[in-house]
Each structure stands twice: as C-alpha cells, then as structure tokens.
Design a protein with these regions (language model features):
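S-adenosyl-L-methionine/SAH cofactor-binding core of RNA-modifying enzymes
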Residues: 54-128
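C-terminal folded domains that constitute the principal catalytic or ligand-binding module
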Residues: 112, 121-220
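Cys/His-rich short segments
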Residues: 1-27
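Short microdomains enriched in Cys/His and/or Lys/Arg
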Residues: 19-47
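Short, solvent-exposed amphipathic alpha-helical segments in soluble enzyme
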Residues: 46-51, 129-133
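Short, charged, surface-exposed secondary-structure boundary motifs
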Residues: 43, 68-69, 91-92, 146-153
C-alpha cells in the first residue's frame, strides 16, 4: 500500500518536516552541490535549507567539472567555497568587513556561498573530481563554531561535527554580520551553543534542534 505523502516536502505524512521550515531571507545567495547519496537521506538537512532560505539552489552530482549550469554561475558570481582546505581563509566574528574583503577582486559580481553536501569522504571526492572548484576562494569557520555541532542523528567523522545546515547558517551569519557571542572567554576557544546567537539565522538553528529530536523519536 502506498504511503500518504506530504505534498510540500514529499515525505510520508508521519515524517513530514514542514514544521521545521521557516522562511529566512539570506542576503548572500547559497548554492549547494549535493552528492547523489544525500538526495533521499531522511536525516539530511539540505531540504530544510532549501525550504527555508529565500535564495538557495541545489545541483546534484559528483564531478561538476563540465556542469554547464555551475560553470555559468561561477562565471557570473564572486564565489566563496565553504571548505576547510589548506588554503582556506577563516571567517571572522563581528567583522563586517568580511563581505568587502571577499568581493574586492570583482565588485561587479555578486557574492555567492557554495557548500558541498555529503559525508566528509564524499565531499572530499566531489572537490577533488570537480576541477572548476579548485581555483575558488575557500573559506572556513573558526574552531569555536566548527566544533560546536549539534547533529545528533547521524554518525559524523568527528565529535561535534556540523551538519550542512549548521555550517551554512554560521557562514552566512558571519558574512552578514549577524553573529553575537556572549562569553567571558575572550579567546573564544570554548563557546557553548547557548552563548551563540546567529541573528537572522538563529530560528533555523533552533528548528534544527527540534528536527534532531523529531528524528530521534523514531528510534523508540
């Protein structure tokens, strides 16, 4: 017997995620390159990103070297690849110069954030295969954010690793000057999640926590 599906999210009605989607205007457009294995992953977070952000596009594949649509986007935007590579620049807290810093090379092109969605191994493979990504400006999150993941429902490569939604919200909040930190530790070596406020993106992160608990409820 066919299961009843929720029309908007295309999931069984018992697993509908629509209540965790909240419309959020992002000044910086988001492009997600998603590994094919993530498309039907019920615990994935890109569906929440795509449903919530007003400017979000998803391309599915593994080797994007000759992807015409992606190459057109790369040619028309100043692209920041969120990827913790050897040459990545760390996005700064309370630095409203972030956007200016990364748009100096070509002010005529709008800024765009690009995120790879997949396990660490699959994201690495996507990056290595996609030669057109290698020349992009790479950015990464500061450690106090990168190590503050609340992704409880999937096995991750390291403790407190971030989901695609968390990483994206943190990056957008940093780029757009939305993050506020309340802690006595000025070094920011350790910051508790409750001390991080991502402004415009905080409701999405709050709903992400609820999404985690919702998924955990199916484990009985």
């Amino acid at each position: 017997m066919a299961r009843n599906l929720c029309t908007p999210c295309q999931r069984p009605t018992s697993a509908c995620i629509c209540s965790f989607i909240i419309e959020t205007h992002n000044k910086t457009p988001l492009l997600v390159l998603q590994h094919p294995s993530e498309v039907k992953q019920s615990k994935g977070t890109v569906a929440l990103l795509n449903g919530s952000l007003t400017s979000c596009k998803i391309l599915v594949g593994e080797d994007f070297t000759h992807n015409v649509e992606l190459n057109e986007i790369l040619a028309s935007h100043q692209v920041l690849l969120l990827y913790p590579g050897e040459h990545s620049q760390i996005l700064s807290l309370h630095d409203k110069k972030n956007e200016g810093k990364f748009t100096q090379t070509d002010k005529a092109k709008p800024l765009l954030l690009l995120v790879l969605d997949g396990t660490w191994k699959k994201s690495y493979r996507m990056f290595m295969l996609s030669k057109n990504l290698h020349s992009l400006t790479q950015v990464c999150l500061p450690d106090y954010l990168a190590n503050n993941g609340q992704y409880l429902i999937r096995k991750v490569a390291k403790k407190n690793a971030l989901s695609s939604l968390e990483a994206t919200c943190y990056a957008l909040a940093l780029l757009e000057g939305e993050i506020k930190i309340t802690t006595a530790d000025k070094s920011l070596k350790t910051v508790e999640p409750d001390n991080i406020d991502c402004g415009n993106y905080q409701p999405m992160l709050n709903n992400f926590i609820k999404f985690n608990h919702f998924q955990l409820s199916f484990r009985g």
